[in-house]
Amino acid sequence: MGSRSENVGTVTREGSRVEQDDVLMDDDSDSSEYVDMWIDLFLGRKGHEYFCDVDPEYITDRFNLMNLQKTVSKFSYVVQYIVDDLDDSILENMTHARLEQLESDSRKLYGLIHARYIITIKGLQKMYAKYKEADFGRCPRVYCNLQQLLPVGLHDIPGIDCVKLYCPSCEDLYIPKSSRHSSIDGAYFGTSFPGMFLQAFPDMVPKHPTKRYVPKIFGFELHKQAQLTRWQELQRLKLVEKLESKDVDLTKSGGFKT
């Protein structure tokens, strides 16, 4: 829309106005105005590399938006704003605070729609392309041999936890290295994405590594009894903490505090 457009029809140089005709351009160009789509601007932000572009047709299909109406205020405005279909006159009459709220709601709604879109056939294909390029990073575990990671949320409800990265090799979760990525809401990727992805692309399921690191001292493995003793001590400490949290006094007969 006009609020996100940038006029490139004229160029100002040393106080003089140079018309578009003086600038070498493609003869096929029939417009002097370039419009940045909201989705393009969103995806272009630093830290948004994990997201793929959701088709506008998917966003405007009411069936795909079921149960999302109450997640933001002025739902219809937000949907129109995301797909650049909101009338300029409405935007011009909004206060600065309302525009900021609209932008915030748009990012939230796009994220929640994104979580649904990436488990569709089209969405999985787009995320597959990003996975092949390791856009989500690689597993830091040495024996996983730079296995590509997949984004996942621990909750489907926004505002609970940030996105995590799942390794299909060691099947463990990791926190993104960049603070820009680690602050993204996990609900924008959902809890089902890795499972759906690996089911859709079974060839991407790696062989689980059998090699594990074994601690050694001067080349010798730790004695099994020493390992068992440490494990037993750890379990004892956990039990003590659990009992104390339930007001059990371990120094008295019967245990319970009076």
Curated annotation (Swiss-Prot):
Listed PROSITE patterns: CK2_BETA
Any one of the GO CC terms: small-subunit processome
Coiled-coil zones: none
GO biological process: DNA damage response; maturation of SSU-rRNA; nucleolar large rRNA transcription by RNA polymerase I; regulation of cell cycle; regulation of ribosomal protein gene transcription by RNA polymerase II; regulation of transcription by RNA polymerase I; regulation of transcription by RNA polymerase III; ribosomal small subunit assembly
Ranges for region Disordered: 1-29
The record's account of how the chain is modified after translation: Phosphorylated by alpha subunit.
Keywords: Phosphoprotein
UniProt feature, compositional bias: Polar residues: 1-10
Role of this protein: Regulatory subunit of casein kinase II/CK2. As part of the kinase complex regulates the basal catalytic activity of the alpha subunit a constitutively active serine/threonine-protein kinase that phosphorylates a large number of substrates containing acidic residues C-terminal to the phosphorylated serine or threonine.
Family: Belongs to the casein kinase 2 subunit beta family.
Comment field (misc): Present with 7160 molecules/cell in log phase SD medium.
Subunit structure: Tetramer composed of an alpha subunit, an alpha' subunit, one beta subunit and one beta' subunit. Interacts with FACT subunits POB3 and SPT16. Interaction with YTA7.
Full protein name: Casein kinase II subunit beta'
